[in-house]
């Protein structure tokens, strides 16, 4: 059985799927969670507090998933392209599922609630894993390839490929191409 806090976060997330944050009312979130409005305010203090907790939960879950798919791809012997493709696939699935993740990746920083820089966190995580797993690659080259692959991945969030597999294949090809190009 979920705690009141989890039920409230779930209700707020569900409401966000139907309308913008500015249109969501605290009384509706409390009712959907099956708790009183006072319980909501005791837990989060304000609508901004609820938003911050929801963003934190979604962001942390997304980034934990990125770490898991990167580790699995590396453990399975994937090359740098396959590792980033795994992160791209996770990103595409989560961007479809969560308006918060989608907004944070596509530049929704002017939105209410304010969103974190998930693209930067994704770029850093993938770059760190690839530099560690593939020590023969130059860190600057890896960082540049990850920047380009991230931009391609975000473009697929905005304008989807026919399938996620197609998008991930293109991301993997891009990373491989950039990392095999002779350095100057």
Language model regions located:
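Amphipathic alpha-helical packing segments from all-alpha helical-bundle domains
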Residues: 60-63, 103, 110-136, 140-147
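C-terminal peripheral helix-coil segments that are non-catalytic and often amphipathic
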Residues: 124-132, 136, 143, 152-184
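Alpha-helical DNA-contacting segments of helix-turn-helix folds
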Residues: 16, 51-58, 66, 118
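Short hydrophobic/aromatic patch on the recognition helix
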Residues: 33-44
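Hydrophobic alpha-helical connector segments
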Residues: 53, 64-97
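Basic, helix-initiating cap at the start of DNA-binding domains
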Residues: 1-32, 49-52, 74
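Amphipathic alpha-helical segments used for helix-helix packing
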Residues: 85-119
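Short hydrophobic clusters on alpha-helical segments that form packing/core surfaces
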Residues: 8-16, 62, 66, 91
């Amino acid at each position: 059985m979920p705690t009141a806090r989890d039920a409230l976060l779930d209700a707020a997330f569900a409401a966000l799927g139907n309308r913008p944050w500015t249109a969501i009312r605290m009384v509706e979130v409390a009712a959907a969670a099956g708790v009183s409005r006072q319980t909501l305010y005791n837990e989060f203090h304000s609508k901004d507090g609820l938003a911050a907790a929801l963003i934190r939960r979604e962001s942390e879950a997304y980034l934990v998933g990125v770490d898991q798919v990167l580790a699995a791809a590396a453990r399975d012997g994937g090359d740098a392209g396959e590792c980033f493709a795994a992160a791209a696939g996770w990103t595409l699935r989560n961007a479809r599922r969560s308006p918060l993740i989608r907004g944070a990746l596509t530049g929704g920083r002017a939105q209410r609630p304010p969103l974190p820089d998930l693209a930067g966190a994704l770029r850093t995580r993938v770059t760190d894993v690839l530099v560690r797993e593939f020590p023969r690659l130059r860190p600057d080259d890896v960082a540049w390839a990850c920047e380009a692959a991230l931009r391609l991945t975000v473009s697929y969030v905005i304008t989807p490929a026919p399938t996620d597999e197609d998008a991930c294949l293109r991301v993997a090809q891009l990373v491989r191409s950039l990392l095999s190009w002779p350095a100057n």
